[in-house]
C-alpha cells in the first residue's frame, strides 16, 4: 500500500512538473511592436515563443498615427514594447502615459549611427518632436532602410527577448543568426542591383524623405517634396522648387509611397514629364497579400521597382 502511494505521488509530481513546464512554454512573451517592420523582425527572432501586437499596421503612417483604446490595452498587458526611437513614433509617449504600462520599452535604434538631415524644403519638416519647420537640421528616424541597421535592430530584439525569457535565449539567438544571414544575402542583391544602374541615372523622387539611410548606404539620390515626416503638406513654393531641381538634376524615375496620398507625386510627374514608376514601401509593410509583406520582400520590391523604372526592365 505504501509502495503504491509513493508511486502515485511520484507520478503526480512528474505530471505536475510536466504541466508546469508546458504551461510556462504555453505563455509566450507578450510583445508590442510600434509598426510593421519591427513586428516582422520580432516574428523572425521570437518565433512561437512570442505573441506580437502591432500598433501601426500594414500601409499605416506612424508619423500621423492616433492611438486607439485597444492600443493602450495592448501596451498595458505587454511584457516588452519594441520601438524605433529617433522620434519616429510621435504618438509613443502619449500611449505610454495612457496605458500606464510596466513593460520594458526597447529602443531598437540603440547602436545605430543616426543621419542628420537638413530639409531642402523648409515647410515640410515639422515631424512631431523631430522637425522644426524652419529648415534646421533634424535626425532622420528611418534607420531601418539600411540593411546594415536592420541587423542592429535584430540584435537588439534578440537581447531584449533573452533578458525577458532566459529559457528561450538559445532559440532567440539561433533565429536571429539565421535571419541575419538572410539579411546579408539581401544586402548583396541590393548592392548588385544598384551597381547595374549607371551613376548618372541614380536620382529618383519619392513622396517624403524616408530613404536617407538607403541613399547613404547604397548610393542612390532621393528627392522629396516632404521632409522626414508626412504630417505637413509642402507649400506651393516647395513643390515649384522641387520641380525645378528635378529638371536640373534630371531625375530618372518618380515613385509614390504606400503610406502617402499619390496626388502630389502625380502632380510633380505631370509637371516634369517623368512617368510614375510604381510604389515604394517606406514606413510600413504591405498587406499580407501584397508585394512587401515582410521586410525582405519590401526591400526586394523597392529595388526591383527602382531598377525597372530607370532601366526599363
Language model regions located:
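Extracytoplasmic metal-acquisition and chelation regions
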Residues: 25-313
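Bacterial N-terminal signal peptides
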Residues: 7-20
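Positively charged n-region of N-terminal signal peptides that target proteins for export
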Residues: 1-4
Amino acid at each position: 500500500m505504501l509502495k503504491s502511494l509513493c508511486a502515485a505521488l511520484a507520478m503526480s509530481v512528474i505530471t505536475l512538473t510536466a504541466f508546469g513546464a508546458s504551461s510556462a512554454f504555453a505563455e509566450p512573451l507578450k510583445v508590442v511592436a510600434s509598426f510593421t517592420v519591427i513586428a516582422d523582425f520580432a516574428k523572425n527572432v521570437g518565433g512561437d515563443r512570442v505573441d506580437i501586437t502591432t500598433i501601426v499596421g500594414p500601409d499605416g503612417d506612424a508619423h500621423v498615427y492616433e492611438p486607439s483604446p485597444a492600443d493602450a490595452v495592448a501596451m498595458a498587458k505587454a511584457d516588452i514594447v519594441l520601438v524605433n526611437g529617433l522620434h519616429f513614433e510621435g504618438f509613443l509617449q502619449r500611449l505610454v502615459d495612457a496605458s500606464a504600462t510596466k513593460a520594458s520599452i526597447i529602443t531598437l535604434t540603440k547602436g545605430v549611427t543616426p543621419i542628420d538631415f537638413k530639409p531642402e524644403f523648409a515647410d515640410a519638416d515639422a515631424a512631431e518632436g523631430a522637425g522644426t519647420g524652419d529648415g534646421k537640421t533634424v535626425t532622420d528616424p528611418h534607420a531601418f532602410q539600411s540593411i546594415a541597421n536592420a541587423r542592429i535592430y535584430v540584435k537588439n530584439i534578440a537581447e531584449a527577448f533573452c533578458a525577458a525569457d532566459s529559457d528561450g535565449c538559445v532559440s532567440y539567438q539561433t533565429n536571429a543568426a539565421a535571419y541575419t544571414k538572410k539579411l546579408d544575402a539581401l544586402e548583396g542583391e541590393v548592392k548588385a542591383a544598384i551597381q547595374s544602374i549607371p551613376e548618372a541615372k541614380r536620382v529618383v523622387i519619392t513622396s517624403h524623405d524616408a530613404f536617407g539611410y538607403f541613399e547613404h548606404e547604397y548610393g542612390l539620390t532621393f528627392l522629396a517634396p516632404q521632409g522626414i515626416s508626412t504630417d505637413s503638406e509642402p507649400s506651393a513654393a516647395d513643390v515649384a522648387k522641387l520641380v525645378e531641381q528635378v529638371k536640373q538634376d534630371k531625375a530618372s524615375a518618380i515613385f509614390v509611397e504606400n503610406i502617402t496620398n499619390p496626388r502630389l507625386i502625380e502632380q510633380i510627374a505631370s509637371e516634369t514629364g517623368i512617368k510614375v514608376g510604381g510604389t515604394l514601401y517606406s514606413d510600413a509593410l504591405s498587406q499580407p497579400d501584397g508585394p512587401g509583406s515582410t521586410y525582405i520582400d519590401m526591400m526586394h520590391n523597392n529595388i526591383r521597382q527602382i531598377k525597372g523604372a530607370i532601366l526599363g526592365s
